[in-house]
């Protein structure tokens, strides 16, 4: 009898705690796991306040239950990665309990201050900024892969210590792959069928929510990618079917080590 009473008491307390969850309790979880993409400058609908978040409560519940969000596929029991997007079971359960309890608003003045986001993750002025010519998507019934070959104008070799790819139109840029053409001989392929990006080696890429690539740049560990003078940067941009007529001007912002910097370990992507 005592055991049954204890079980009933625990269930009662658990139910009460779930019912007491309000936005202030889950806001930190959204700020930690979601708003790096879900903000006014990101690819997803913003989750920066109660109204924006609660409007999508059902979609959030489905995405969490299906393990679709945060978007991260690797199995952490095998290996771990930098910039992982795991959400803990405790955090996940708390959001689901909040939603099942009616996504209660509560006193939003007690919620933490939202993080501040800007158009660029790296706000310093880049050493080199290359922007594709304004392009009108030709992806009607099929996805379109378009390659833009952008001259760097470099008069000497430089070593990259960071770069940021910025989607010009986040609504239609599915992903971007960046290669370096050291001879500077590549040309644009605007056909929509540029499936094999040209170039001698990869600089990196971009997908929604991806942070800038920033290499360690202070002793004892300095790393970077060398770009030879007169090279071109080739951007392969993937536009999804149905985006025809939409315009885009995606760019890449590159930051170099000062000329003459020594002790930099080469990075091969």
Model-identified regions with their sequence ranges:
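Bacterial Sec-dependent N-terminal signal peptides
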Residues: 1-25
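Extended low-complexity, serine/threonine- and proline-enriched intrinsically disordered segments
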Residues: 169-191
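Aromatic- and Gly/Pro-enriched helix-to-coil junctions and flexible linker segments
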Residues: 20-148, 232-236
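Noncatalytic modules at the cell exterior or secretory-pathway interfaces
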Residues: 160-163, 224-241
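Exoplasmic/lumenal beta-rich domain surfaces
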Residues: 185-204
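Histidine-centered active-site/metal-ligand motif
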Residues: 38, 170-175, 238-240
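Solvent-exposed, flexible loop/coil segments flanking beta-strands in beta-rich domains
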Residues: 112-172, 243-269
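Beta-sandwich interaction modules
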Residues: 200-232
């Amino acid at each position: 009898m005592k055991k049954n009473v204890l079980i009933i008491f625990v269930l009662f307390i658990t139910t009460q705690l779930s019912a007491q969850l309000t936005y202030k309790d889950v806001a930190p979880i959204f700020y930690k796991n979601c708003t790096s993409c879900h903000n006014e400058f990101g690819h997803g609908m913003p989750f920066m306040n109660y109204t924006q978040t609660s409007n999508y409560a059902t979609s959030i519940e489905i995405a969490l239950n299906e393990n679709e969000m945060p978007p991260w596929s690797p199995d952490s029991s095998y290996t771990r990665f930098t910039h992982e997007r795991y959400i803990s079971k405790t955090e996940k359960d708390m959001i689901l309990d909040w939603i099942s309890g009616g996504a209660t608003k509560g006193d939003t003045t007690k919620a933490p201050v939202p993080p501040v986001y800007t158009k660029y993750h790296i706000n310093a002025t880049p050493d080199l900024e290359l922007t594709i010519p304004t392009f009108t998507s030709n992806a009607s019934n099929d996805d379109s892969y378009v390659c833009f070959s952008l001259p760097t104008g470099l008069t000497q070799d430089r070593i990259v210590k960071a770069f940021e790819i910025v989607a010009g139109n986040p609504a239609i840029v599915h992903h971007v792959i960046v290669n370096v053409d050291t001879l500077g001989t590549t040309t644009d392929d605007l056909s929509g069928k540029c499936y094999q990006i040209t170039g001698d080696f990869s600089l990196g890429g971009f997908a929604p929510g991806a942070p800038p690539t920033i290499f360690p740049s202070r002793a004892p560990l300095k790393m970077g990618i060398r770009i030879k003078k007169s090279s071109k940067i080739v951007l392969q941009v993937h536009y999804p079917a149905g985006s025809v007529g939409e315009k885009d001007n995606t760019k890449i912002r590159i930051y170099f080590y000062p000329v003459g910097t020594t002790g930099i370990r080469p990075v091969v992507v």
